[in-house]
Amino acid sequence: MKKESFGIILPITLLAYFLILMDNSIIFTSSVQIGESLNLTDTSLAWVSNAYTLTFGGFLLLSGRLSDLLGRKRIFQIGLAIFGLSSLVIGLAQNASMMILARAIQGIGSSIIAPTTLALMMDTYTGEMRIKAISYYGATAGIGSSVGLLIGGGLTSFVSWRVGFLINVPLTLLLMYLTHRHVVAKAGHQEKIDYLGSLLSVAG
C-alpha cells in the first residue's frame, strides 16, 4: 500500500505561518535595540507592537472572508507580498513613523496569511492527512515562537535586529514562486462582500 505524501502544500503553509510567528518573537527580544537604534520614545516603542496587533486583529475576519470569496491562492499571494514588502521597509526603517507604519501594514499581511494557510490545508488534505497537517500547524505555533526568540536574540547580539526582517524578503519571494507553481487556483464563492460588516469588523 503506497504511503500518502503531503507534497509541497504543507511546507508552503507551515513556512509562511512560521515567518509571522518568528517576527513577533524577534520584536519581543529586540525591542531595546530597536528603540536605541531609532531613538524611539517609550510610547513609540510600544506602538511598534501595538500597530501590528491592531491591524492583525482588525483585518483577520475580513481576510478570511476575502479568501472564501476571491480564492485562497490569490489572497495568499497578496498577503505574502504585503508581508514581504513591509518587512523590507521595517528592516530599512530610519525613524518611528516609518517603523510603526510598516508594522501596521505587516499586521495586515499577517492577518491574510494566518487564516489562509489553514484554509489551504483544509482544502488540500482530507481524513488522516488533514488531522496530521493540522497537528503540524499547531506544533509550528510553539516552535515558531520559541525559535523566533533564539533567532531574534542571536541576530540582535551578533548581527542586527534588521536582518530578522530583511530575511523575510527572499523567503516570501520563494513562497510566492512556489505558490504560483504548485497551489491550484480555485474559484471563490459567488457571493457579494458585506462591506458594512467588513468595515465594522476592522473598526472593532
For each of these PLM feature ranges, what is it?
Residues Q33-G35, G64-R65, L69, G154:
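Membrane-interface helix termini in secondary transporters
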Residues N50-G64, A114-L118:
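Central cavity-lining transmembrane alpha-helices of secondary-active solute carriers
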Residues G58-S97:
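Conserved MFS/SLC helix-loop-helix module at the cytosolic interface between two early adjacent transmembrane helices
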